[in-house]
Structure formats: C-alpha cells, structure tokens
Amino acid sequence: MKPAQKTGRLTIGLYNSYNIVQFREAHRRVVARAAPLAEAFDWNLAVFGFPFPPELDTSDKVAGWISGTTSIGDEGKYTVELSDRGRLLVFDLPKRGFPPQLGTLVITTRKPWKERSVSVMDLARRAASGESLLLLFGLGPKGLPQELFEIGGSHFDVTGKGKSLETCTAIGSVVGSLSTAIGRLLEEKS
C-alpha cells in the first residue's frame, strides 16, 4: 500500500476591503459561507482586517460568536469545527506581506495580469507537489487593492474568461475546481 500523498496546505484568504472600522453583516456572512467550504474540502480559512468587536480577540471567540448569530453552515457549526482544528485564522490587515506560513500568495481576480496569470491546473500541480497556497479574495465592490496585485506572484481567474462572480460564488468555484484538479492529479500519480 502506498503512503498518502502529501499536498501543500490550501487557505481561503478573505481580505476586508469594505469598512475597516465598522463590522457589517457582509463580514459575518462571508465567514459563515466560506467556513463550510473550507471544512468540506479540507482548506484553512484566514480573515484579514475584519473589524470584529474588541472582545472577539481569538479565533475561538470569533467562531463562537458567528455560530450564535447565523443559520448558515449548519448554524455556524463548521466555523466552530474549523476553529477547534486550528484552521480558522484571524489577522489584522498585513502591513508588509502576508504570513509566510499560509503559503504562496495567489490573487483571485477576473482581471489577471497576463504575465502572472495561472490556470487551475498550474495551481493544482503546485499544490500536489507540496506547495502551500493562500488564495486571496477581496470583499466589497472594489475587490482587492492594486498594491496586492504587485505582491501576488500569481493571479487566478477561475472563469478563465474575465467574468465577474459574486464573492461567495467565486470562493466556491475556486475551492471546488482546485480541489477537484488536485484530486485528479493525485489519482493519476497513484
């Protein structure tokens, strides 16, 4: 029997480009919607710059609070499970890049720079070979700030056609397509 193939760690990164001072319903909902995806497909979930109330100073407290305020994700059960497994991560907005333990930064966008554009199979090969990846999604109508496009060495358009998707639809599409592609690559190797 062959040992299980070790892949890189995959992380959904949610970057707050809404209001950085006031916590909004959209913040709570996107975490509640992304957590079941992370749990189902064995990804991490990292949030950056969310203005949680000050008393929510740990991921466990954030998960508990979200689970008490939503019916999404089996009433927040998956958010709590992610946190219990150390896979819900809460960070301030990064000032000098993203935490290296999350992996290589990949910008998700419908407008990738041509020279940095990657396909789902490119990302799947990298993850299947052991590279950890942080796939970053911008929240709000403007998406990710342009300065993040500079530091993201890879840009990924899940549609491959420049089509705009609602944030949670994009997250589900990225997680599903990349997880499936990795699974197929690993099946081919075994």
Tell where the protein language model's regions lie, with residue ranges.
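Short, Lys/Arg-enriched, disordered terminal segments
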Residues: 1-5, 187-190
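Short, well-ordered alpha-helix to beta-strand connector turns
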Residues: 42, 102-103, 131, 151-153
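Structured adenosyl-cofactor binding patch, chiefly the S-adenosyl-L-methionine
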Residues: 143-190
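Short acidic, S/G/P-rich loop/turn micro-motifs used as interaction or catalytic elements
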Residues: 18-20, 52-55, 112-115, 140-144, ...
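Solvent-exposed alpha-helices and their adjacent loops that cap or buttress functional pockets
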Residues: 3-6, 98-99, 125-129, 148-149
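Long, charge-patterned amphipathic alpha-helical coiled-coil/hairpin "stalk" segments used as oligomerization
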Residues: 109-148
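Short, glycine/charged-enriched secondary-structure capping and boundary segments
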Residues: 27, 60-62, 120-123, 149-152
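RNA substrate-binding interface of SAM-dependent RNA methyltransferases
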Residues: 2-110, 176-180
